[in-house]
């Protein structure tokens, strides 16, 4: 098992070796299971995935954990960059 604090800041890479960004937060359900990772996108990923970069700050997507293939020095996804285009941006409540 890995501590949540050790996940934050880890790089997130697609299965085709595209650097998506890094984990900024995790979302949990009522049973304390991680349901989504919030990934702060790189500038390149923001453009590649079709998001508009805000004047200040970054775009963050909410990626369901079933898309994670492996956790090590980096987070490896089971999707390629094209398959990420349907992942929504995280909206603040």
How should these model regions be labeled?
Residues 1-93:
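Peripheral interaction segments used for macromolecular assembly
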